[in-house]
Amino acid sequence: MGFWKFPPFLVLSILVLYQAGMFHAAPFRSVFDGRFDPATLDEEESRLLLAAMVNDYEQMRARESEKAQKTEGSRIQKRACNTATCMTHRLAGWLSRSGSMVRSNLLPTKMGFKIFNGPRRNSWF
């Protein structure tokens, strides 16, 4: 039964490939058929073209400088941390990073209630 479905598919695929080959044989042409030759421009057109190129260049440089200022401003803002909240967060981060070192180096390993004068048990009761 599947054999009867195969030939129409084969014919359809050959037709599609043939049409694709026809479109490929005649490619679309661009707006400019030849290369751009600046020698064919008169003086006014060349001045207008130069002004447009300079304007585009200035706009590109302005966008780049604005982008650089935005990223530079955010870096400066992150480095300058003078508010109380920011300093508290920095101190908390520093303490959490150094806490494991303090615990391992300065505190005794066997800490119990007797070290800090905890409740004593009398043996005579």
Curated annotation (Swiss-Prot):
GO terms for molecular function: calcitonin receptor binding; hormone activity. One of its GO terms (cellular component) is extracellular space. It holds the Pfam family Calc_CGRP_IAPP. Residues 26-77 form a propeptide. Residues 1-25 form the signal peptide. Keywords: Cleavage on pair of basic residues, Disulfide bond, Receptor, Secreted, Signal. It is found in: Secreted. GO terms for biological process: adenylate cyclase-activating G protein-coupled receptor signaling pathway; regulation of cytosolic calcium ion concentration. InterPro entries: Calcitonin-like, Calcitonin/adrenomedullin, Calcitonin_CS, Calcitonin_gene-rel_peptide, Calcitonin_peptide-like. PANTHER family: CALCITONIN GENE-RELATED PEPTIDE 1, CALCITONIN-RELATED. Belongs to the calcitonin family. Stimulates cAMP production in porcine kidney cell line LLC-PK1 via the calcitonin receptor (CT) but not via the CT-like (CL) receptor. This is Calcitonin receptor-stimulating peptide 1. It comes from Bos taurus.
